């Protein structure tokens, strides 16, 4: 195939799609250029499904090569290793709008790899990767119901910005990524500076409108490339099996969905499934039916039973009305030795969230393609298997945990103080101890309480809520605070976090087409009512940050010295600073501009370290009297330490008004003596006198 190129203007950027020259053995491959940011995105689809495959094995890997930024990786091996958090998040960002566009019965393995090969540090690779994945899949000839487009939206001075640069995002009130087909929005990921629901919805519709040019260009590319439509055909339904299954189940599933407790409901459904499969075992054997297909169709019955019930009755499987939030229980300060903690329970979803305060040096150093930087606000989300009553793998975080942690972090970012306002590194850890839907939003609520319990001066409390949707033709219901089953069996997962003032984070995943602006508007308004209710429940535990830090949290003292004095504080080979930290038990961070931050759980120790540093950096004044310690005896006099790191010479003639034959007769090393500063010469050498003090000359240093 000859090389095909398509170029178009997208916001301020010139975007070019190329195919037919690179990675020609892949099912589909595209080079995406967005100014100087260049990605190779490939899609490979297996010709057939593996034997016994019962799920769609789609894998998405986004990777940033260090050579893209003209850098060599750090570390011993000097090569890229496991995926970074950013790479994992963008991989999920690509996966989410693509997965629902494949047919339900398609089980062939599909792998998408997006490689950043050149990076303009002001243009991120996320939108280019989404566009490239859509184009590569469209070229691959898979049964992909695309293409999709993608756009990033900023908001400043009341206007939306299409595909803002990283520089523009620094003072933007919004960073929102939206992806979708020509007719439907499928995915939204955003963080915002407490904007209204109307502004957020406007950003979604603006992005969807602008991305149409991407979809049109990809369609033109596939036509010019001569891509053949997929020949895959969905397997025919076994109508006899489905009829037999429906007859065997009868009204049992409808009854099971009336059980309000999650675990009891799950057990009831499992028992029905077991009985039904046993009752049909004879026909499975005689008619050659597949047990896997029988299980799949049982799942379809579950799906329709729950959906039909809520659409007909407007009552949910746990007995709630459509807009009712589950009972909430909140406690702050539940762990005595931590710096801040909270227990947040909403129905059968529960999180213990802990805040830890550290110094600037505790920040995480990120070795990124665009350059190294430090992250001083860390948010970690853990989802152990016991939270859903199961046994499972326990160890490094999975992609889902990284994604949920990032969403929860987005939820509270808008209210966090700057490092200048609160010079601590802050780590928040959310331990999900029970889960039945919306655990990421429980993490938002719990983290808000834990931060306030730790005394972090957040601007306002934050709460989060997950919304759902069930839609059949023109009938639909919007569900507040969804359960796990409602998420799994519904058509939309719509998470909103924010304060009473506005939205701080919005995440949306839609599984069907036909979600109108009106439906999204209703979901946002219903979410606002739920969020305000949750904030009211949270206020029963805490309404504002605590005035005092935990007794176990480090206290920070900040002082400023002239940058030229830094070497005096550090000392030769770090000797001075090491001595201060060892003797006072403090941790000291020195910045290039002369800012010194002293950290200690003990306030008295921090003050002692501060005094030592002030002594070291203070200037020695001629005419002043200091109390010092004899450091060294010489034939011609004695060296006396008058301040940490500052020694002066008392010449033998300045020891006493009487004649001194031998210095050792008058002074010993370690003696404490009062000395007057006679002179500080241009080289910084200090001349001292004991004799002048005895004669009553000079002003004591303490007089300062």
From Swiss-Prot:
Localization, UniProt: Cytoplasm
Q: Name one GO biological process term.
A: mRNA catabolic process
The organism's superkingdom is given as Bacteria
Limits of the KH domain: 554-613
Q: Which UniProt keywords apply?
A: Cytoplasm, Magnesium, Metal-binding, Nucleotidyltransferase, RNA-binding, Transferase
Q: Give the matching Pfam families.
A: KH_1 (PF00013), PNPase (PF03726), RNase_PH (PF01138), RNase_PH_C (PF03725), S1 (PF00575)
Q: Which residues bind Mg(2+)?
A: 487, 493
What are its cofactors? Answer: Mg(2+)
Gene Ontology cellular component terms for the protein in this record:
cytosol
GO MF terms here are: 3'-5'-RNA exonuclease activity; magnesium ion binding; polyribonucleotide nucleotidyltransferase activity; RNA binding
The S1 motif domain sits at 623-691
Q: What is its EC number?
A: 2.7.7.8
User: Where does it mainly reside?
Assistant: cytoplasm
Gene3D superfamilies in the record: GHMP Kinase, N-terminal domain (3.30.230.70), K Homology domain, type 1 (3.30.1370.10), Nucleic acid-binding proteins (2.40.50.140)
Catalytic activity, reaction form: RNA(n+1) + phosphate = RNA(n) + a ribonucleoside 5'-diphosphate
Q: What does this gene product do?
A: Involved in mRNA degradation. Catalyzes the phosphorolysis of single-stranded polyribonucleotides processively in the 3'- to 5'-direction.
Family as reported in the entry's similarity comment? Belongs to the polyribonucleotide nucleotidyltransferase family.
Quaternary structure and partners: Component of the RNA degradosome, which is a multiprotein complex involved in RNA processing and mRNA degradation.
**What NCBIfam families does the database record attribute to this sequence?**
polynuc_phos, PRK11824.1
Protein name, per record: Polyribonucleotide nucleotidyltransferase
Q: Which gene encodes it?
A: pnp
